[in-house]
């Protein structure tokens, strides 16, 4: 009987699914791959994975499915020369896998590996379906993530809660934000922008979150669900009689109100929230809350009591639950957390590679770190999902291998994913590498793993990159990559594209140009190598953007020197470079606007929904908000992208209009002005005033008036790449070399 049951179980596994989630993952990488591995899950108090050999099969052993998946990834990189990343999550494995000749074991005491920033869910994941989420969870498992933030569908919880509190569907629609802006609603920054959401959206996201949570748990991950810290609609005082604090504005947006955790009705509202959350998505061992996010200290708030009230509300759901909180600017406020019990709070040191708070020098240094509370060393890396090569390799390694008392793990806290895979690969390996190493030694192995080949030119290109653009120095606190000149609103002093990048020059543009030259010099040899072609386009894109910044400076110098002929030539060259960038990026689906807008359109089930979601997608990456929020609030171009389609149809018209306005102004200065004969209205001006008038003047254009119409359009952008990456990269290099 036992044999029969075993036989039936084996048949069931082979017909319907594989017998463990890592085998399933291997099959998604390459059909038939699971037959080449032997997966062994064993009990251990230590987090580990082992690589071993048993006959023709590679053995991957570990104490959790995630750790085993990490071992699979290690083997694929360093034995098989296969690198899986966002641009390539499938690969053809060799018929016979390279043997593990000597057993290899990796252990770590950094047992928690976190993933995601609230912003990631809007800047990258706003319109993802299950198929895309499944790939992401595979990526997470392969890179050791076992503590992922899981906030998809939070709006479903809020809708149910608000209905029970007496809010109408129309009122709820004015409170909950649209798909591309949910993250900032969840962080208590804004209300309603991008909405109202249709009922089908709530149904879609509830189903999606349940699929996400099931897969995460199957892989031994511990999802971090959103907790409750007092957010209520701004009209909650009038509607519900709640004693709330007006949170004011956030970059021009009306913020939701705050029900103070010390209020007598806080427990009631929090209980209602957690009940609805549990009904939909179950209980969790970790809950995320970030009260008072990016807000000034309020003398009317007793932060210690507020923290205790939020903690108690969470503990009523699960007495063993841990509160996960971001270490960002003034948060978590010491007054709120100093009295909390060790183990009840887990702090994400959000920007550890640049602005660590855990006790080593930085502008955000806390002399005592987070005191008794455990925390995670996190890589922020990216803001706004901007496109650009960037990293802080030396800072990352130096900070990680410093004294980190109470550190329990690492975290990926990027605002946008699907960029700079080299930095995320490096970060994911740190828990498994107890001894400090150099970026130069590591990059050699990375390059061989990423492309599956050894090549001196490629290695030289990457050595240049890791010692220049991927090595932003300590003291430079810029937020994310060097922003492309193409993406900024034009002006005489254009430097950064967004309002808050804090960008500084820290590498020589000649370095990215030389790295691009080296990659292009061997491009024909690696035509068809997916990872190589992705990096070839990305590195050449960076070189072209860097050279275009110099071309811009030449053009503005022509204007200031009143050299009309050279101005016309240099302006035309700049615009030619911009259009070449558009063409280059069109050769890869990842860099096409269509992959973003089409996901938005596909999320809709009716023409009206498709229109709303596409508008959300277009606004987020351009104006971000209405005129006031874009201009006065400063949000315009925060999420700018060097993407095919966006360059040609959004950024190009801005620059063309600007250069035409400058040319017209130069022409006007050469025209006769008889009204000024004898001094005219200038007769009474001082010499200093006349001198200022004689200087080259800025032109004033209403950029928002140019930008908003594009956000309202519905012209299609395709996903499918156009042209050969190798051929178009060569054309881009030819253009770079001319200038």
Q: Model regions: which residues?
A:
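Extended, compositionally biased alpha-helical segments that mediate assembly or anchoring
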Residues: 643-739
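Contiguous, structured surface segment used for ligand recognition
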Residues: 18-110
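Active-site-adjacent substrate/metal-binding segments within catalytic domains
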Residues: 110-132, 140
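Second-shell loop/turn segments in exported
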Residues: 57-62, 122-127, 199-200
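Bacterial Sec-dependent N-terminal signal peptides
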Residues: 1-21
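C-terminal substrate/ligand-recognition segments
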Residues: 502-525, 537-560
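Catalytic-core regions of glycoside hydrolase
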Residues: 83, 87-97, 116-120, 141, ...
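Acidic/histidine-rich, surface-exposed loop or edge segments in extracytoplasmic proteins
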Residues: 52-55, 117-121, 193, 531-535, ...
């Amino acid at each position: 009987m036992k044999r029969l049951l075993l036989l039936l179980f084996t048949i069931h596994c082979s017909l319907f699914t594989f017998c463990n989630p890592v085998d399933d993952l291997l099959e998604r990488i390459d059909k038939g791959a699971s037959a080449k591995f032997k997966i062994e899950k064993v009990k251990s108090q230590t987090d580990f994975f082992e690589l071993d050999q048993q006959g023709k099969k590679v053995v991957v052993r570990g104490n959790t499915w995630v750790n085993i998946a990490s071992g699979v990834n290690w083997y694929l990189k360093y034995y098989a020369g296969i690198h899986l990343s966002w641009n390539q999550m499938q690969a053809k494995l060799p018929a016979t896998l390279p043997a593990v000749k000597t057993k290899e074991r990796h252990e770590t005491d950094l047992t928690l590996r976190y993933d995601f920033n609230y912003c990631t869910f809007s800047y990258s994941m706003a319109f993802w379906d299950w198929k895309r989420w499944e790939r992401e969870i595979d990526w997470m498992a392969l890179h050791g993530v076992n503590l992922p933030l899981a906030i998809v569908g939070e709006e479903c919880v809020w809708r149910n809660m608000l209905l029970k509190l007496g809010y109408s569907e129309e009122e709820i629609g004015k409170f909950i934000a649209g798909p591309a802006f949910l993250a900032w609603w969840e962080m208590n920054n804004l209300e309603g922008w991008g909405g109202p959401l249709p009922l089908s959206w709530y149904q879609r996201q509830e189903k999606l979150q349940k699929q996400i949570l099931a897969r995460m748990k199957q892989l031994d991950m511990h999802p971090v669900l959103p907790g409750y810290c007092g957010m209520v609609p701004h009209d909650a005082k009038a509607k519900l009689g709640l004693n709330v604090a007006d949170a004011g504005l956030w970059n021009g947006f009306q913020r939701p109100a705050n029900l103070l955790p010390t209020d007598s009705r806080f427990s009631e509202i929090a209980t209602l929230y957690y009940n609805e959350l549990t009904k939909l998505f179950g209980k969790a061992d970790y809950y995320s809350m970030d009260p008072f996010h990016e807000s000034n200290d309020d003398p009317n708030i007793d932060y210690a009591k507020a923290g205790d009230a939020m903690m108690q509300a969470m503990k009523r759901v699960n007495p063993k639950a841990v509160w996960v909180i971001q270490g960002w600017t003034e948060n978590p406020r010491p007054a709120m957390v100093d009295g909390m019990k060790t183990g009840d709070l887990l702090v994400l040191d959000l920007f550890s590679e640049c602005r660590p708070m855990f006790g080593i020098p930085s502008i955000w240094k806390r002399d005592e770190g987070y005191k008794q509370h455990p925390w995670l060393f996190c890589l922020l890396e990216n803001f706004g999902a901007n496109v650009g090569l960037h990293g802080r390799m030396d800072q990352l390694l130096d900070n990680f291998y410093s004294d980190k008392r109470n550190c329990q793990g690492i975290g990926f806290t990027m605002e946008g994913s699907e960029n700079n895979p080299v930095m995320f690969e490096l970060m994911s390996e740190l828990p498994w590498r107890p001894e400090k190493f150099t970026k130069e030694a590591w990059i050699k192995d990375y390059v061989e793993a990423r492309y599956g080949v050894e090549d001196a030119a490629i290695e030289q290109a990457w050595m240049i990159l890791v010692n220049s653009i991927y090595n932003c120095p300590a003291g430079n606190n810029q937020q994310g990559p060097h922003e492309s000149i193409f993406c900024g609103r034009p002006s005489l002093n254009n430097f950064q594209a967004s309002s808050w990048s804090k960008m500084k020059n820290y590498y020589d543009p000649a370095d990215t140009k030389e790295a691009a030259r080296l990659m292009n010099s061997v491009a024909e040899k690696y035509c068809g190598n997916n990872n190589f072609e992705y990096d070839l386009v990305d590195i050449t894109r960076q070189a072209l953007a860097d050279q275009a910044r110099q071309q811009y400076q030449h053009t503005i110098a022509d204007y200031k020197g009143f050299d009309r002929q050279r101005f016309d030539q240099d302006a035309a060259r700049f615009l030619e470079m911009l259009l070449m960038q558009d063409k280059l990026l069109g050769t890869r689906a990842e860099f096409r606007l269509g992959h973003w807008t089409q996901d938005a359109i596909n999320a809709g089930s009716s023409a009206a929904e498709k229109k709303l979601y596409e508008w959300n997608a277009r606004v987020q990456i351009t104006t971000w908000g209405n005129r006031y929020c874009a201009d006065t609030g400063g949000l315009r171009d925060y999420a700018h992208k060097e993407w095919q389609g966006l360059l040609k149809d959004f950024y190009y018209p801005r620059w063309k209009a600007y250069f035409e306005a400058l040319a017209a102004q130069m022409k006007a200065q050469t025209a006769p002005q008889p009204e000024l004969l004898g001094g005219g209205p200038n007769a009474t001006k001082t010499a200093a005033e006349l001198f200022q008038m004689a200087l080259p003047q800025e032109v004033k254009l209403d950029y928002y008036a140019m930008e908003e119409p594009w956000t309202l359009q519905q012209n299609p952008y395709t996903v499918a790449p156009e042209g050969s990456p190798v051929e178009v990269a060569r054309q881009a290099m030819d253009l770079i070399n001319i200038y």
